[in-house]
Amino acid sequence: TGELGLYKKLDSEPVKYTHEDEQYYKVHFESMLNYERTFAEQHRLSGLLYYYMSSEQKMNKDIDDKDESLRSMYAIPIRYQGLSGRITYGLRDTYFLDLNFGYTGSANFAKGDRFGFFPAVAVGWVPTGYDWVREKLPWLDFLKIRGSYGTVGNDRLTNTRFPYLTLLKTGDGGGWGSTNGYITEETIGADNLKWEIAKKTDIGIEGKLFGERLNFVVDVFYDKRDGIYQERQQIPDYAGLQKMPFGNVGKMVSYGSDGNISFTQNINKNMSFTLRGNFTYSANEVKNWEQAVQKYDYQNYSGYVNNAFRGYIALGLFRDEADIAASPKQTFGDYLPGDIKYKDVNGDGVINDDDKVPLSYPNYPRLMYGFGGEFRYKNLTLGVLFKGTGKTDYYFVDDNGYWDKGKNGEGYIPFYGGKTGNVLKIVADQSNRWTPASYSGDPSTENPNARFPRLSYGKNENNTQFSSFWYQNARYLRLQEISVNYNLPAGRL
């Protein structure tokens, strides 16, 4: 037995609570009119007219108490209204025509620019609708060729309400020793702000062959986006603006293709199998990006992919002191033989920010694909699914250039936290890293093409720069799923 000892760790405090008052409402109205009719058994005509209107408002007392401008913004509801329509015509299930339009209004724009008109057209042709095609090509069950072109508007350009308005700010002490109040332009409004418009083009083909055992769909698309909302960067300082205004100045295109295919075969009345696959490929290019005038063309964002990784081109590792002396000066702290050697892109004899170039796409896959199938025997089904990516770039250093702020290199980079962290066996292995001959006793370990630079204690500024040295092809193929299904006959349940 023993005695329970009690020790006072914290002083008692009164119970506290918080209270938040928040109100939200939304009103939505919509109506729709449909029309459909078939004439002479060959002409199919349908139409749709759709109207909607919405209004929503969020009122937060904390915001109301703190900021007069925010209170004013939240006092005005967020409102939209729009009218859209579609006319569809089909002739003998062989020729198709779709006409669409959208007339949408948003409160995010100034009066006169609030409504945008966005038309679209789509056409389709089914060659298998002809009798002679079915007779000449009996193995072709269905074939459709289609294309579309249309525009889509975007008003979600910024998180700020009414970006076309210029906001004023008041304060005390106007400078130069004065204590008088002042009024200044806090935000310059984009008074000519308009809808961001995407022009979308798509061409596709669909087919069913061999008694509909083989089915496929393939699409090719091209999108051109104009009027991307960006902060102006080319206004000179002598304009006297503390904050740059925004405008519809950005342009970008994206393009790609996607499709799927499947094949089903009955072996006998109890046994069959299905094979299927799909893919998606996409890429983009910035046509105009608002930025200050750059010294070198490769520093421009225009002409390159959106959010391209930018960094230094690695030339391997410094072989020895003579190699360092004969190379351009690198401005990332001290460096020794075995450290990463970078390319002097502009040829000025110094490696600095002016030598950063676009290295590759960002680290999302440009190509995604999958394939699999099922094998069926009576009530038993076995299935398998594979997924993979291609054209995927990855770097073992974060793209902000600071290893201690990102997570890409964690567990892979020695002493990731500066003077703390792990050293993986793959890095410590002398066959994978540059090692001085004075330590290994073998001159061949001073390999300028080693997978890793010299092993150094603490953060090495020279080796932590974002560069092609840390590039890794991140494509993969994995077994996503294996399934086994058995259907119990209804009579046994």
Predicted features along the sequence, with ranges:
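A short local loop/turn or secondary-structure capping micro-motif enriched for an aromatic residue
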Residues: S106-A107, R225-D226, Y361-P362, K391-D393
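C-terminal beta-signal and adjacent terminal beta-strands/loops
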Residues: P138-D141, R225, E285, E374-Q465, ...
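Glycine-rich, charged/polar anion/phosphate-binding loops
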Residues: T187, D355-L359, R366-F371
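Conserved small-residue
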Residues: G250, T264-N363, Y394, G401-D404, ...
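P-loop NTPase catalytic cores that bind/hydrolyze ATP
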Residues: N278-T280, L367, F371-T381
